[in-house]
From Swiss-Prot:
<dbReference type="GO" id="GO:0009341">
    <property type="term" value="C:beta-galactosidase complex"/>
</dbReference>
<feature type="compositionally biased region" description="Acidic residues">
    <location>
        <begin position="648"/>
        <end position="658"/>
    </location>
</feature>
<feature type="active site" description="Proton donor">
    <location>
        <position position="142"/>
    </location>
</feature>
<comment type="similarity">
    <text>Belongs to the glycosyl hydrolase 42 family.</text>
</comment>
<dbReference type="InterPro" id="IPR017853">
    <property type="entry name" value="Glycoside_hydrolase_SF"/>
</dbReference>
<dbReference type="GO" id="GO:0004565">
    <property type="term" value="F:beta-galactosidase activity"/>
</dbReference>
<dbReference type="InterPro" id="IPR013738">
    <property type="entry name" value="Beta_galactosidase_Trimer"/>
</dbReference>
<feature type="binding site">
    <location>
        <position position="107"/>
    </location>
    <ligand>
        <name>Zn(2+)</name>
    </ligand>
</feature>
<dbReference type="GO" id="GO:0005975">
    <property type="term" value="P:carbohydrate metabolic process"/>
</dbReference>
<dbReference type="InterPro" id="IPR003476">
    <property type="entry name" value="Glyco_hydro_42"/>
</dbReference>
<dbReference type="GO" id="GO:0046872">
    <property type="term" value="F:metal ion binding"/>
</dbReference>
<dbReference type="InterPro" id="IPR013529">
    <property type="entry name" value="Glyco_hydro_42_N"/>
</dbReference>
<protein>
    <recommendedName>
        <fullName>Beta-galactosidase Bga</fullName>
        <ecNumber>3.2.1.23</ecNumber>
    </recommendedName>
</protein>
<dbReference type="Pfam" id="PF02449">
    <property type="entry name" value="Glyco_hydro_42"/>
</dbReference>
<keyword id="KW-0479">Metal-binding</keyword>
<feature type="binding site">
    <location>
        <position position="153"/>
    </location>
    <ligand>
        <name>Zn(2+)</name>
    </ligand>
</feature>
<feature type="binding site">
    <location>
        <position position="151"/>
    </location>
    <ligand>
        <name>Zn(2+)</name>
    </ligand>
</feature>
């Protein structure tokens, strides 16, 4: 496990580089990413190249025992190129052109831009093919950032028609597959089909799904262009890309097929503000949500089933969310350890030094604008010392898979049927319940081989093919345990309802059908009660009902046994909401509601019990554990102190006792005879051995 940083030598006088790079080495950093936005500096005018500054920076990094990770500089085409070839610019659905003046203003389907991309990538990779100090390359930067996966220009229109022709073969097949008889939307040829622009009413959902798939595929092709050229220059380099958090428009699994390792950019306190389901708590505003960040860690680790990188780790306050609270003391260390617990090989902080100009002046670095240490520098230096005491990176062995399906995400985004129905948030509800029991999770696409998992959670497989239904049936019949969420098996691969009861091809497997569904505003009572539990009018103590939200399905069991029934003042009262069916040697549970935390935890623990997966007592909110490489990580995303009474202090590989300002015996914890260990606010403990199912955590 290694640390690094993102550096922009082109922003600073060259006489300051030595001081900067020496301070990086002093902090124990090992990788330095550079040049992702440097095209205008590398080629200030067509055909005139200036590599001397980058040559010097790379050499300096190597002289200090570090390695450079270079980037193809295509995220920021220079002004002279935009003026020469204006057709490279993206267009919005209404025809508005995205002008020069920020970044990511190019179209992935522009033949002109692909030509220019090949030219600059060939030139920079050839330049450094023999450098011993360049470890690998990042392709471009954050594909799709600023809502740029989907473009609607003439080049995209032509490419979309070609993509459709390749997929469907003839126009009659497309019309039938989409169901274009609705509202007279039939096409006479592929040439008649345009990208979905402004319309009086909503677009055809099958057309929207097709455009989402096409747009993602366009990025896959563009990334492959970079990867092929990088490997042609030097096959020993690794190729990666820095994806983004909770990012819905790009299929990361498809892009990753052309990468050697997957990376992503993690900004926890920003994510809980601009892409979070609900209002962030004070602790989350200081440290983020471990499950929101953790699910992205697990998506990107699982994409290639190998250790991943965090290419940009938040170093302090950031400039782009609505507010920029300072992270909690030690949070920058916490985030690096949290990534390591989820399988990260390397964590690079963004950025080295707060910049003096441009759009990111209010984005912190590890160093302040004057070059002096900022808050994150001490955290980074401390973490590098701790990482050096831990063995090299190892594989994360996850007994549970969560199935994440971009096609279903796009289909549900087209027809959410409730203003707060968010596919990603629904995934996190189920994912968080498993992680809340300390169990490691792979987040995999529907095409993944599930045979190695003890249990599978599929929160919203909205689009289900016959092949997928058969594979799931075989998995369960062979002894697998599956938990489905609501809106599963509803549509075919083209985003059309089937002429059969839901959950469609999964009906026999589930052993029940969906009679009715409803989307519910928050003000309606939304609770269910476990079947067989005492009720309020019985002589026994009544078990409290548990809550759900947003979505409800009334289930009609056939072979399945009801597990939970609605406990509401309404027409669903008493109807089954959750059922379980036995198929061969395994079982499947279908949950017809969006579960709140107590119900999600109950479903997860039931699943883990049936699958024989060891798990912890339910963890406090904001506290997570993870097992990797013979060690257990405890990460505390809260301002509370944690006591772990069963843990022998001698078993600690990393703890909080060396943190500046932390006293493990402070305040109400001064009893030196107390058993166990203490983890401080926003703190970390790494324990030798696997203690997941024997761990008890108390907040103090």
């Amino acid at each position: 496990m290694r640390l690094g940083v993102c550096y922009f030598p082109e922003h600073w006088p060259s006489e300051e580089w030595e001081r900067d790079v020496a301070a990086m080495a002093d902090a124990g950093l090992e990788y330095v990413r550079m040049a992702e936005f440097s095209w205008g500096v590398l080629e200030p005018e067509r055909g005139t190249f200036d590599f001397e500054w980058l040559d010097e920076a790379i050499e300096l990094i190597g002289d200090h025992g570090m390695q450079a990770v270079l980037c193809t500089p295509t995220a920021t085409p220079p002004k002279w190129l935009v003026d020469e070839r204006p057709s490279i610019r993206q267009e919005d659905p209404d025809g508005t052109v995205r002008e020069h003046g920020s970044r990511r203003h190019y179209c992935f389907n522009s033949d002109a831009y692909r030509e220019e991309t090949a030219r600059i990538v060939e030139r920079v990779t050839e330049r450094y093919a023999d450098s011993p100090h360049v470890a690998g390359w990042q392709t471009d930067n954050e594909f799709g950032c600023h809502e740029t996966v989907r473009c609607y220009c003439d080049d995209c229109a032509d490419a979309f028609r070609t993509w459709l022709a390749d997929r469907y073969g003839d126009i009659d097949r497309l019309n039938e597959a989409w169901g274009n008889a609705f509202w007279s939307q039939q096409y006479g040829s592929f040439d008649e089909i345009d990208p979905p622009g402004p319309t009086p009413a909503e677009h055809h959902p099958s057309r929207l799904l097709a455009y989402a798939r096409f747009s993602s595929d366009s990025v896959v092709e563009y990334n492959r262009l970079h990867a092929d050229l990088i490997r042609e220059a030097d096959p020993d380099w690794f190729v990666t890309h820095n994806f983004m958090g909770r990012f819905p428009t790009l299929n990361a699994y498809d892009v990753s097929e052309d990468l050697d390792r997957v990376a992503w950019d993690s900004y926890p306190t920003g994510f809980v503000q601009d892409r979070y389901d609900g209002e962030a708590s004070p602790d989350q505003l200081r440290a983020g949500d471990p499950d929101q960040v953790g699910m992205d860690h697990d998506i990107y680790r699982s994409a290639l089933d190998r250790p991943f990188w965090v290419m940009e780790q938040q170093p302090g306050d950031v400039n782009w969310p609505p507010h920029c609270p300072q992270p909690g003391e030690g949070a920058m260390r916490l985030w690096a350890h949290h990534a390591a617990a989820h399988g990260a090989d390397a964590v690079l902080y963004f950025r080295w030094r707060r910049c003096l100009e441009g759009q990111e002046q209010y984005h912190a670095g590890l160093r302040k604008a004057d070059g002096s240490p900022d808050r994150g520098y001490a955290d980074a230096a401390h973490t590098s010392e701790e990482f050096a005491t831990l063995d090299g990176a190892s594989h994360v062995d996850a007994p549970v898979a969560v199935v994440f399906d971009y096609d279903s995400l796009w289909a549900l985004n087209a027809q959410p049927h409730a203003p707060d129905f968010d596919y990603w948030a629904l995934q996190e509800a189920f994912y968080g319940a498993v992680r809340g029991r300390g169990v490691q999770v792979d987040v995999v696409p529907p095409s993944a081989d599930l045979s190695g998992y003890a249990a599978v959670v599929a929160p919203a497989l909205h689009l289900v093919t016959e092949d997928l239904a058969d594979r799931l049936t075989d998995y369960i019949a062979g002894g697998g345990e599956v938990l489905f969420g609501p809106r599963t098996g509803v549509k075919d691969a083209e985003n059309k309802l089937r002429p059969m009861s839901q959950p469609g091809p999964l009906t026999d497997l589930v052993g029940a059908t969906v009679d009715q569904h409803e989307s519910l505003p928050r003000r309606l009572e939304t609770t269910v009660r476990r079947v067989g539990d005492p009720t309020d009018d019985s002589e026994e103590i009544a078990a409290p009902p548990v809550s759900f939200r947003t979505w409800a399905e009334w289930l009609d069991p056939d072979a399945a046994e009801p597990q939970y029934a609605y406990d509401v003042d309404g027409p669903a009262d008493g109807r089954p909401a959750v059922v379980t069916n036995t198929v061969g040697d395994g079982q499947v549970t279908y949950c017809g509601v969006w579960p709140e935390s107590d119900l999600a935890d109950a479903l997860a623990s039931d699943l883990l019990d049936r699958a024989g997966v060891r798990y912890a007592e339910r963890l406090p909110d904001g506290v997570r554990i993870g097992y990797r490489g013979g060690r257990t990580w405890v990460t505390n995303f809260t301002s509370d102190r944690l006591r772990l009474p069963e843990i022998d202090p001698e078993s600690l590989a990393v703890d909080d006792t060396d943190r500046d300002g932390f006293d493990p015996m402070a305040d109400d914890d001064k009893d030196s005879s107390a058993d166990g260990i203490v983890v401080g606010p926003y703190g970390v403990a790494v324990i030798e051995g696997d203690c997941v199912d024997g761990l008890r955590i108390a907040q103090t």
